[in-house]
Amino acid sequence: MSDFVPHDLIPDLWDEILRRHWMFLETEESIEKLEERKQLEGCLKEFLCVVQHDRKFFLPETGHVLRRSVLELPDFSAQNAIVAFETISQYANNLFTKPWRKEYRTLKTYSGCFQHDIQSRLLDAEQLFLAMGYRRAAEDTFVLEGPICPDQVTNVSRDAMAAYVECQIMKHIYAGVTAAGYVCTWKDILQFRERYVGGTSTTIKEMVRQLSEKRVRMEQPPMQENTYSNVVSAAPTACGMRSNNVAHHPSSSGTCALHPNGLNEAGKYLPPYPAPPPQQPHLPGPLMTHSRSLDHYQEPQAHLPHRHSFDQQLQQQCQLPHVYEAPYDCLDGLSMGSSASYAAVTGAYNAPGNRYPLPYNISSQLNAPYASPADFYGNGQHTNMYATLGKTGPAHSCDLHRRQPNTSAAAAAALAAMQHRQSTYPPDHHLIDFDERAHLTQHDFGTHDYDPQYAELRGQVQPSMRGNPVAMYATYGGYDLPTTLPQAPPPTGQDMYIYARPVPKSSRMRALAEAGGINSTDKHPRSAEKQSTMDNNRKMHKELKERNSRTAPAKRSGTERDIPTTISDLNSYDSASLDGFVALDSSSSPPLMPKVQEGVGSFESWNYVFKNLERSGYTKDLGDREDLLVQSLDLGSLSITNGGAAPPAEKRREATNPTNGEKARTLDKKSGTGRREAKVVQAPAPSPLPNSSSAGVKKVKSALKTAVVDNRGTGSRQRTGAVPKQPPNVSPQLIVTSPNEWSCSFCTFLNPDTKRICEMCCRSKDFNLEAASAASSSAAAAAASAASVSHASSTCV
């Protein structure tokens, strides 16, 4: 199982290991066996200190288990690995010395010994058992079939002991390095042992030396480097604004670029490079300095008569020969390591026609190396990446006039810089456009005052309501809209781009064209910024449009068709369909509250339900009204009629006054419990009239499939005056039960029609609770109840 040839490397030591291992296995349990084990461990330790790491173990599985356990096991320690390898070695020794024991031929991985001593301390330890000759019979069972192979078992036993000794060596190294005052991990020790060959003391000395050098390198300051210049800057000592006898930067024209009086003859003709602040002498100078000339980009030409370089002083007349003859600008002001400025051209720096114009507001996008907006020379206390146009002017490069920043000022400056960068470009044309979820502010609901689409509605609104968007929406379209509109809190600077997502330019142009903002073929999309800032409804996101289409009332067509709201198919009987339902435009009505979407709510969201109830024969004077929130079936107002032409009042009279063979039974629901009473009217089977047609029969059958929800409310309802034709009322028996089931009169359990005994209470199908109570009082009442039972049984089927 291995190409390891130990005799070619150290024949004598390897022979000694093999001989002592055989003696250890054949020795009985005694003091002598302990001595043999100590001698064997000594030979293994000497062998592991003189061979390379890939030759330490005879089986490659042993090295794999040790390496993976050290690298991947979270709580690995050498002591835990010692216990695990010792257990594996002992198991192999028992299998070799006592192969007749049946318990050694079956290994259960869920046993306590395997779980606590092996599985939790090593990874892939099963590979060593497979190397012994076991095979996996199940997920948690290993079985050894047939006679054992002595060579395989002894190889695993010897390799497990070698790994046991290797873990002891790692443990000693860890203790030695820790005692020297350094911190190392088991992974560091294993990797060092894999690269270097040596004993315990040699490894400790070498690791301590490397850790010491690493600590020294970390304590040293980083090397000063300037990516854009070969000039190393030193810290200035003072500002030369008020005196000329102070020290100046050896390679600059002055310590403060804004104070021209601090010039000396030695540094007058050198290229001007800004100096870092003196409180950080060990840090490198700024890499991307801000051009002070760009701060005055829009000033008149007379203010900047001789500004040839970004950091050049006004009095500096002598210039070195320039490199390029084109009016280009070097944005970093450092000339890329050259001593001549790329922008050293004739004429004033900002003179018209002397240079190509920079992009829109690019001066606000340049910045010092990641400092605050008012700090152009790198303050380590600020981490703002974007610049802004400060009203106080650019700061000095010296620390003499710099105000000490505090924590609140730094936070406010960072916030202002972020907001200013976003406002630098037009609102719809940032450097990277985003598919943002726009916040709805209060001004969004006043768009109708500025949008032409609301011009035609202004004549319909009362003069007192003009200018009041809430009052206008309350009567818009003839509906009673809620008078309370959602008021979103004003968004802050941090909330403006929380849900931003980059979108391609083609999608942005198409979205703007669909919204009516710009033309898709427009070459200058920046003209869109001239549009009104209060047309946010035109760019409302997709979720708001869907909410409006679901909750807001529909635009009425010329015929004013009603929408049926029944449980069954809408086309089951002759009624109005959804063909006339026009989707509501997103900008014609304000969004309703989210609670209205969930079915609890306003009159306008349920108006189509009330319209359908009117078509079904519902009137105001049908009786006491129930709670609006109690939405259930009004079984008392449902009945089956043959003709379907009687007025609603007559139907109600017929339902409340049963005659001849009609009987009525009332469900036991007391009024004291707060629940409404529901009556089930049972009519005899309809018989066809002489003048009835097949179409009328089909209407009755289709009406039986429809259940109308009676949602009565306490508020006033508008009536159209005309009552459309209505479907016949439905019997509650057809709603509650199916044709193949019957409801028990005692426990209301639904039983299959094939059984006549209730499966829940063992009552008969013909059992009647009222009849049973009446039978105990009098015989006459029993006879009457029996007749009622016989009548009720015919309708439960």
Swiss-Prot record:
Entry keyword set: Cytoplasm, Developmental protein, Metal-binding, Protein transport, Transport, Zinc, Zinc-finger
Other information: 'Tamozhennic' means 'customs officer' in Russian.
GO BP annotation list: protein transport; regulation of protein import into nucleus
Subcellular compartments: Cytoplasm
Listed Gene3D superfamilies: 1.20.58.2190, Zn-finger domain of Sec23/24
Function: Has an essential role during oogenesis and embryogenesis, perhaps in modulating the levels of nuclear import of additional proteins. Modulates the nuclear import of dorsal (dl), Dif and male specific lethal 1 (msl-1). Negatively regulates nuclear import of dl and controls the accumulation of dl in the nucleus after immune challenge.
Organism whose genome encodes this protein: Drosophila melanogaster
Pfam families given in the database record: SPATA2_PUB-like (PF21388)
Name of the protein this chain belongs to: Protein tamozhennic
Positions annotated as zinc finger (RanBP2-type): 735-766
Oligomeric and partner information: Homomultimer. Binds to dl and msl-1 via their nuclear localization signal (NLS). Also binds to Ran, Ran-like and mbo.
Disordered: annotated span: 515-570, 638-697
InterPro entries per UniProt: PUB-like_dom_sf, SPATA2_PUB-like, Znf_RanBP2, Znf_RanBP2_sf
Keyword Zinc-finger: yes
CDD domains, alphabetized: PUB
One GO cellular component term: cytoplasm
Comp. bias regions, Basic and acidic residues: 662-679
PANTHER family: PROTEIN TAMOZHENNIC (PTHR15326:SF2), SPERMATOGENESIS-ASSOCIATED PROTEIN 2/TAMOZHENNIC (PTHR15326)
Chain ranges passing through the membrane: none
Keyword set includes Transmembrane: no
PUB domain ranges (all copies): 79-146
Gene Ontology MF terms: small GTPase binding; zinc ion binding
